Amino acid sequence: MATNSSGDSKNTLYCSFCGKSQHEVRKLIAGPTVFICDECVELCMDIIREETKASGMKATDGVPTPKDICEVLDDYVIGQATAKRVLSVAVHNHYKRLNHAQKAGNDIELSKSNILLIGPTGCGKTLLAQTLARILDVPFTMADATTLTEAGYVGEDVENIILKLLQASEYNVERAQRGIVYIDEVDKITRKSENPSITRDVSGEGVQQALLKLMEGTVASVPPQGGRKHPQQEFLQVDTTNILFICGGAFAGLDKIIKQRGKGSAMGFGADVREESDAGVGETFRDLEPEDLLKFGLIPEFVGRLPVLATLEDLDEDALITILTKPKNALVKQYQRLFELEDTELDFTDEALSAIAKKAIERKTGARGLRSILEDILLDTMFELPGMESVTKVVVNEEAVCSEAQPLMIHADEKESATAG
């Protein structure tokens, strides 16, 4: 501790690190024979944060096993057992490959295996990718393929994907280079026709070509604050070699291509001929071959950069009911918590849950449509409830889902009389 011996300042305390007096800082914390100010504490915290960020992903051990990854996925994503196994193994191998590359003396180079997720709308593709990033504690970003164009054209440059990943990693290049990128709607960037055209296809095949470089590994020059590149700007160099790319899409119409290919072998006596309606879209995707993706409009090089194929199935009524009620962040639990904040209990009858699931199947929106259905059912109730003090319970029954009827509201006096009776 330093003190000033002159006049009234004899008892003034000073920070032992920066030398500022107690009057120059907001807080001075005392220790045995030393003092530290709030500014020095903040500086120390910044240094520790930077150290933690830099070393966060340098550990060569600790990659979760495929079984561990799959178990965590089970907590958040219902069904899709095959897709979960494929993803768990692929992601485990990817990060094991990175740790293998860090060790000296490895003469065998392990190639990267990017992933293609194919499945109907609302079956869990995006949620799977988000959950994987959460399990592994790596930076994660999502991009919509429909907004991308080739460099130099109006639209979003593909390198903006890397900028978003960099932002997700708080501009820590080391962490960003081990992140996960999920590109949604890749089925919308297919070639407009199978024949070469004189006009340039800047939002279809052109985007596939631009994504190829990122997916196979290149050093992308990213403007630190985003926006368009200009010559006077300094760029951050990000190597995409170790970034895991997961592409996803509904691929509407791909099932017809697969069935058409299957028809060729279902000829002659004794052939197993199935009606088209026998199999759902998700079930048909199980028979997917790379040649089907080429016919759909993906270029061979793009398909080649996505060696791991995981197909997801349609969600049936039971699966949708489970999604509504079982996961940690299930929609029913979320709405029940919202109602708890109003000191009101929210309950759904089994018939209501079944009717909600059927409605989502009819709309062909899968799990994605469940929230909007619940919002429609509970909108008026949530509007009125904050101004009603006596309501203790709200019950959503089948009538509230299938007709214009409102959920049942149980008031405190009704509950008391029912208990007394």
From Swiss-Prot:
<feature type="binding site">
    <location>
        <position position="40"/>
    </location>
    <ligand>
        <name>Zn(2+)</name>
    </ligand>
</feature>
<dbReference type="InterPro" id="IPR003593">
    <property type="entry name" value="AAA+_ATPase"/>
</dbReference>
<dbReference type="Pfam" id="PF10431">
    <property type="entry name" value="ClpB_D2-small"/>
</dbReference>
<dbReference type="GO" id="GO:0046983">
    <property type="term" value="F:protein dimerization activity"/>
</dbReference>
<feature type="binding site">
    <location>
        <position position="37"/>
    </location>
    <ligand>
        <name>Zn(2+)</name>
    </ligand>
</feature>
<comment type="subunit">
    <text>Component of the ClpX-ClpP complex. Forms a hexameric ring that, in the presence of ATP, binds to fourteen ClpP subunits assembled into a disk-like structure with a central cavity, resembling the structure of eukaryotic proteasomes.</text>
</comment>
<keyword id="KW-0479">Metal-binding</keyword>
<dbReference type="GO" id="GO:0051082">
    <property type="term" value="F:unfolded protein binding"/>
</dbReference>
<dbReference type="InterPro" id="IPR027417">
    <property type="entry name" value="P-loop_NTPase"/>
</dbReference>
<feature type="binding site">
    <location>
        <position position="15"/>
    </location>
    <ligand>
        <name>Zn(2+)</name>
    </ligand>
</feature>
<dbReference type="InterPro" id="IPR010603">
    <property type="entry name" value="Znf_CppX_C4"/>
</dbReference>
<dbReference type="Pfam" id="PF06689">
    <property type="entry name" value="zf-C4_ClpX"/>
</dbReference>
<feature type="domain" description="ClpX-type ZB">
    <location>
        <begin position="3"/>
        <end position="56"/>
    </location>
</feature>
<feature type="binding site">
    <location>
        <position position="18"/>
    </location>
    <ligand>
        <name>Zn(2+)</name>
    </ligand>
</feature>
<dbReference type="GO" id="GO:0009376">
    <property type="term" value="C:HslUV protease complex"/>
</dbReference>
<dbReference type="InterPro" id="IPR019489">
    <property type="entry name" value="Clp_ATPase_C"/>
</dbReference>
<keyword id="KW-0067">ATP-binding</keyword>
<dbReference type="GO" id="GO:0051301">
    <property type="term" value="P:cell division"/>
</dbReference>
<comment type="function">
    <text>ATP-dependent specificity component of the Clp protease. It directs the protease to specific substrates. Can perform chaperone functions in the absence of ClpP.</text>
</comment>
<keyword id="KW-0862">Zinc</keyword>
<dbReference type="InterPro" id="IPR004487">
    <property type="entry name" value="Clp_protease_ATP-bd_su_ClpX"/>
</dbReference>
<dbReference type="GO" id="GO:0005524">
    <property type="term" value="F:ATP binding"/>
</dbReference>
<dbReference type="InterPro" id="IPR046425">
    <property type="entry name" value="ClpX_bact"/>
</dbReference>
<keyword id="KW-0547">Nucleotide-binding</keyword>
<dbReference type="InterPro" id="IPR038366">
    <property type="entry name" value="Znf_CppX_C4_sf"/>
</dbReference>
<dbReference type="GO" id="GO:0051603">
    <property type="term" value="P:proteolysis involved in protein catabolic process"/>
</dbReference>
<dbReference type="InterPro" id="IPR050052">
    <property type="entry name" value="ATP-dep_Clp_protease_ClpX"/>
</dbReference>
<dbReference type="GO" id="GO:0016887">
    <property type="term" value="F:ATP hydrolysis activity"/>
</dbReference>
<protein>
    <recommendedName>
        <fullName>ATP-dependent Clp protease ATP-binding subunit ClpX</fullName>
    </recommendedName>
</protein>
<keyword id="KW-0143">Chaperone</keyword>
<dbReference type="GO" id="GO:0008270">
    <property type="term" value="F:zinc ion binding"/>
</dbReference>
<dbReference type="GO" id="GO:0140662">
    <property type="term" value="F:ATP-dependent protein folding chaperone"/>
</dbReference>
<feature type="binding site">
    <location>
        <begin position="120"/>
        <end position="127"/>
    </location>
    <ligand>
        <name>ATP</name>
    </ligand>
</feature>
<dbReference type="InterPro" id="IPR003959">
    <property type="entry name" value="ATPase_AAA_core"/>
</dbReference>
<comment type="similarity">
    <text>Belongs to the ClpX chaperone family.</text>
</comment>
<dbReference type="Pfam" id="PF07724">
    <property type="entry name" value="AAA_2"/>
</dbReference>
